[in-house]
Amino acid sequence: MASQKPHLNLITIGHVDHGKSTLVGRLLFEHGEIPAHIIEEYRKEAEQKGKATFEFAWVMDRFKEERERGVTIDLAHRKFETDKYYFTLIDAPGHRDFVKNMITGTSQADAAILVISAREGEGVMEQTREHAFLARTLGVPQIVVAINKMDATEPPFSEKRFNEVKADAEKLLKTIGYKDATFVPISGYKGDNVTKPSPNMPWYKGPSLLQALDAFKVPEKPINKPLRVPVEDVYSITGIGTVPVGRVETGVLKPGDKVIFLPADKQGDVKSIEMHHEPLQQAEPGDNIGFNVRGIAKNDIKRGDVCGHLDSPPTVVRAFTAQIVVLNHPSVIAPGYKPVFHVHTAQVACKIDEIVRTLNPKDGTTLKDKPDFIKTGDIAIVKVIPDKPLVIEKVSEIPQLGRFAVRDMGQTVAAGQCIDLEKR
């Protein structure tokens, strides 16, 4: 049973042409849940077009076209299993989507595969550095490096070339703080060393890519952190009372607990908790729950409030300092700019009061102090003042409530995380 295995969110990162899609295709087709009839259709079509080798990249492109044409291939098919785990692949097509998904935590990745091409003239490139730095900054705890296109080295499957690329990648990962990455030579296109050892690389004695993925660790549930339940909705149920609904991000909630909702500043006692219409004696991180609170009326609290225990209440800020990445802004962002910040379930207009400094995306060192403005692609430290009280936490303390997206003009213009705060 798949659901009995621990589940990990896995993100594939790396330069756009280094073979991510091919590798993802290979994993999904060999171990995933793409229905056999779809594979068969592709196989026939590939043969007719003289692509009898059944090129995975081509299949992935078809996959993409079908999605674009609105023939949805359910996201459930982006899952694959190993002996030990059940993985969901968060494939990041574009650089911007990748950063946005990563930062907003809609898909907090538990681990990453960094794909680097071993082909001459490729190797560690600009985007490789940026993706790796962002993965680290945004809290992806563990990484496996897939040194891809080993079939395209000179000569093919060259141990010397593998060692060169590995040395560069190792240096990069050490500078940004990944201590113990595994480096695996593969060919996503030909399938070498993806699921089983390759006869073409007898010199390599390490794990296959799948074995390396199985060596990842399961993240621990943050049950020892203070309780935080961002409110998604509030219902008033006849005969029961006020029932807020939301997902437990950190900590543990039990019937009988004394809780406070902030910034609403309303207190109450938890009478009962339900998940999927079943009573719960204890709610833990990841649980989507409804809970009945005595002493609170439906209109006292709303979406965006956060529930915590009375003795360690959620943090309401007057201002905070954030590290942001500008993803997509048509002009420039200067002090005084006031977009909408999406933090957990809250949406609050916030003013960028000061641009403290910009950072080098490759290593996080300071580029410029107090610049006049920032633009798409920049990483900056900024001071932010919300229009009204807002709950946000330091990413170093409760990362689940420390990340946010910045929206304006119908798009995500930036994303970031809270690194310091001034309590209200």
Swiss-Prot record:
Residue ranges constituting the tr-type G domain according to the UniProt record: 5-223
List of residues binding GTP: 14-21, 91-95, 148-151
Family annotation (InterPro entries): EFTu-like_2, G_TR_CS, GTP-eEF1A_C, P-loop_NTPase, Small_GTP-bd, T_Tr_GTP-bd_dom, TRAFAC_GTPase_members, Transl_B-barrel_sf
Region (G5) location: 187-189
Enzyme class label: hydrolase
Enzyme Commission designation: 3.6.5.3
Residue ranges of the region described as G2: 70-74
PANTHER family referenced in this protein's UniProt entry, alphabetically: TRANSLATION FACTOR
HAMAP family: EF_Tu_A
Primary role: GTP hydrolase that promotes the GTP-dependent binding of aminoacyl-tRNA to the A-site of ribosomes during protein biosynthesis.
Protein known as: Elongation factor 1-alpha
Organism, scientific name: Thermoplasma volcanium (strain ATCC 51530 / DSM 4299 / JCM 9571 / NBRC 15438 / GSS1)
The encoding gene: tuf
